[in-house]
């Protein structure tokens, strides 16, 4: 993957997250802000989830209340480099725990 492909894939990932949060109709208040390739999700209880690009490594990193994860793009999916778990299920799990209700990203 070259830098241009990485940027396109990472941009699409961030856009999907934004669209999911814009369409979220649950009771939890989840705000997001994107600045310089870093997206921060802020929850009512004061916790945060941070998603950022690591361009030199062509990775996307996810930092949640319970841990940090590094994702590589393989076979059409962002997969954790340690567990091979996909990005969206991990993000959904973390966001649901931090929001106190189900939040589903896909």
Curated annotation (Swiss-Prot):
PROSITE patterns registered for this protein in UniProt: FRATAXIN_1, FRATAXIN_2
Keywords: Iron, Metal-binding
Taxon lineage: Bacteria, Pseudomonadati, Pseudomonadota, Gammaproteobacteria, Enterobacterales
Organism of derivation: Serratia proteamaculans (strain 568)
Protein name per UniProt: Iron-sulfur cluster assembly protein CyaY
Similarity-based family: Belongs to the frataxin family.
GO BP term, pick one: iron-sulfur cluster assembly
Superkingdom as given in the UniProt entry: Bacteria
One GO cellular component, as annotated: cytosol
Gene Ontology molecular functions: ferric iron binding; ferrous iron binding
Claim: Iron is one of the keywords in the record: yes
SUPFAM superfamilies noted in UniProt: Frataxin/Nqo15-like
HAMAP family in the record: CyaY (MF_00142)
InterPro entries in alphabetical order: CyaY, Frataxin/CyaY, Frataxin/CyaY_sf, Frataxin_CS
Functional note: Involved in iron-sulfur (Fe-S) cluster assembly. May act as a regulator of Fe-S biogenesis.
């Amino acid at each position: 993957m070259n830098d241009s492909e990485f940027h396109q894939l990472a941009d699409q990932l961030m856009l999907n997250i934004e669209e999911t949060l814009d369409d979220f109709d649950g009771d939890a208040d989840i705000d997001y802000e994107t600045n310089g390739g870093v997206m921060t999700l802020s929850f009512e209880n004061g916790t945060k989830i941070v998603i950022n690009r690591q361009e030199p490594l062509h990775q996307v990193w996810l930092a949640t209340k319970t841990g940090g994860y590094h994702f590589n793009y393989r076979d059409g999916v962002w997969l954790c480099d340690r567990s091979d778990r996909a990005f969206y299920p991990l993000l959904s799990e973390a966001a649901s725990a931090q929001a106190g209700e189900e939040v589903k990203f896909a």
